[in-house]
Structures are given as structure tokens and as C-alpha cells.
């Protein structure tokens, strides 16, 4: 099993490319199942979750290949041909490691009238039920049962298409919105999704579907209208830049007292995070071709309290990374997690490095080290989920001595060559076998 060894104390400096967004690429790979024509996706990151999704759709009889970019730090191109798809089923063996595999349910059901998808796995950061997916597809006329760990969906006897419907989810759900959006493109009539997720990745998926011939309005708002069509065609689509990877590098550069250009980063997708960074004393600018960030120095940062909410609020996927920054800043901050339960598992590991954090339920209070003269000290820590692992890397970049991060397979699920990109910015970091 691989681990990362980090010798901290170096300010990150230079420029680094931001890869395509995992959370856009995964639903877009599933969207390719909606058509029998070839689909080409550009700027697809090389991640374990992407590899798992490709394996999943190949298992159905889909032809899919992922060619690499020109260098280790560039994303690649995926070509998919689902014309010969023969098995509309996603088995447990592949689904268990990745929650996003549930996104195959809507496209398979819409195109073939049936689908069998295992209940999903992924990071252990809460239950995150799929009941909203089932509720929405049922409103569109699907008959769905859950048995033996599988969701088994089919159209009623005599029906060849899902039916348009007005669907209001009980909560804002990104994957739920995406699943219902994809299913609605081939439904008979108009579907209205109320309380829809507004994330940039949802917007990017909608733009891909429109390029395939879908009729969609309102994406990026809480109400999306979809007029179903009888068939979709192939397309070429570029995956939007990963705002969470960009936010992670913003925090890493800020925490280490550095300066960098994040090529391809989209500042307009990170307003809530950038506002907090600026309040902390960090200079962040949207420039031609990316985002420029300059830190006043780790000891000069001002700790910031925040509360995670749905987009366009502060993203839960940036909570752990910003907490690592607060650890080395001046002052006391309060972090409230409202999206997922059990998402403070990184706190115990940060404590091993010398952080001062008290967590109780959904709230963590951080006493910054910036005005105490104390420093984080390297230690061996264990990644517990994807974003928690990123927070430990950031802390390790600041700590004195060597920090070893175990179980980095979590990191590989969501970051494309993170250690290589950090080395390009001057970090002393290497991947080794445990």
C-alpha cells in the first residue's frame, strides 16, 4: 500500500494545472450511456473513481478507452461507444467502492426501460441515502424495488418511456439532480426538477446533454425544466475544471506562505472559498487562464469561521482543507458541518500533528497556532476519506520534520497526481511503498 512522505517547511511557488472535475466526469461518463452514438470527453482526470466507472460501463458491454495527456500532470481523453451495451446492470463488486455508480441508474432506465444497480459505497462520511433518486424515478413512472442489496427498476408493462413529471426532492441532492436530469432527457413530456442542485458540475452535465440534443432550461438554478426527446446523439464535450482541486491548492499555497498560478482554475466557481481566503489575508485574483494566489505567510493568516452549505455556499468538500489552514492561522475559528454527519474524522489525525481542535457533533473549534509561536510537528497520520487526506497533506506541508500519510488510496480517488503537482510547486513530497 502506498503512502506519502512529506518534509514540510517549504513555501509553494510556481504554476500548476487544474485537472477536469471528478464530480463532473463521473456523471458525464454515465450520460454517454443515453445514446448509441460515440461520445468523446476531453479533460478527464486520471483518478481511481474514473477508472472504476470505466470498468463498470465496460462490464455492460460498452467500448471505452482513456488515453492519457501529453504529460503526467495533464488530463486525458475518453472515447465511449455504448451502441453495443448488452447488460444494463451495475454489480456490487464494482459499485461497492464508489457511490457515484448510482448515476448509471437513470440513463440505463431511460434508454432500455430497465436497470439493476447495486446500492453504492464510497467514502464513509455518512449514510447519504439514495431514496431521493428512487422517489424521483418512481414519479416518472418507474417501478423500483430494493432487494438483496440491489435497486431493480423497470418500466410498467406496455410503457416504452419514462413519463415527464414535476419532482420536488426533500433535500438538495447533487447526484439525485443529475440522475433525474439524465433520465428526464428521454422521458415522454416535460419534467420539472424543483429544489435542484446548482453546482457547476450539474451545469456542466446539462451542457453536455444539450450538446447531445437534450432540451434543458434553468440549469444553475433551483428549477430545471427538461422537455424529453426520443433519442440523443453523440457529442464531444470538455469536462469543466475541478473547483475542489483548485480550492485545495489555494489552501495549500496559502498555508505554506507561497505564491502560485492555478492554470485552468475557475474563480467564479469558488466564490465562497475565495471570500474566506481574502478575509484571512490571502490575495486571490482571477486572471487570464486561471487563478493567482499569494499568501502573506502562514503566521500572518487570520483564522476564519464558516458553515458548509449547498452551492453557492461554502462546499463541504473544502471543509477539511480550510480547517488545516485555520490550524496554522492566528485566532480561534468555528467550523460547522451541515451537509454530512461524521465528517470530522480528520480532526484526530490533525491533533497528532499538534493542532488544537475540539470537535463536538457538527461543530469544531480550532485554536490557531499562528499567534502562539507553536508549530505543527511531523508524525505518521492516516487518511480516512478523500478530502480528509488532502487536509493532512496540507498540514504536512507546513509541519516541521517528516509527515507520513498512510492509506492514500483515498487521495487517489479524487486528486490527479497530487504529489507530482506539489513537487512542481517546490514541495518535498514523495510516494513510497509502505
Curated annotation (Swiss-Prot):
Active site (UniProt): 123 (proton donor)
Chain residues that bind UDP-N-acetyl-alpha-D-glucosamine: 99, 128-132, 317, 339
GO biological process, one term: regulation of cell shape
Predominant place of localization: cytoplasm
EC numbers, comma separated: 2.5.1.7
InterPro entries attached to this UniProt entry: Enolpyruvate_Tfrase_dom (IPR001986), Enolpyruvate_Tfrase_sf (IPR036968), MurA_subfamily (IPR050068), RNA3'P_cycl/enolpyr_Trfase_a/b (IPR013792), UDP_GlcNAc_COvinyl_MurA (IPR005750)
Residues holding phosphoenolpyruvate: 22-23
Catalytic reactions of this protein: phosphoenolpyruvate + UDP-N-acetyl-alpha-D-glucosamine = UDP-N-acetyl-3-O-(1-carboxyvinyl)-alpha-D-glucosamine + phosphate
Source organism superkingdom: Bacteria
Record keywords, A-Z: Cell cycle, Cell division, Cell shape, Cell wall biogenesis/degradation, Cytoplasm, Peptidoglycan synthesis, Pyruvate, Transferase
Compartments it resides in: Cytoplasm
Pfam families: EPSP_synthase
Gene Ontology MF terms: UDP-N-acetylglucosamine 1-carboxyvinyltransferase activity
Pathway terms, separated by semicolons: Cell wall biogenesis; peptidoglycan biosynthesis
Residue(s) carrying 2-(S-cysteinyl)pyruvic acid O-phosphothioketal: 123
GO cellular component term of the entry, any: cytoplasm
Functional summary from the UniProt entry: Cell wall formation. Adds enolpyruvyl to UDP-N-acetylglucosamine.
Family note: Belongs to the EPSP synthase family. MurA subfamily.
NCBIfam families on file: murA, PRK09369.1
Protein name as it appears in the record: UDP-N-acetylglucosamine 1-carboxyvinyltransferase
Organism: Paracidovorax citrulli (strain AAC00-1)
Lineage, uppermost ranks: Bacteria, Pseudomonadati, Pseudomonadota, Betaproteobacteria, Burkholderiales
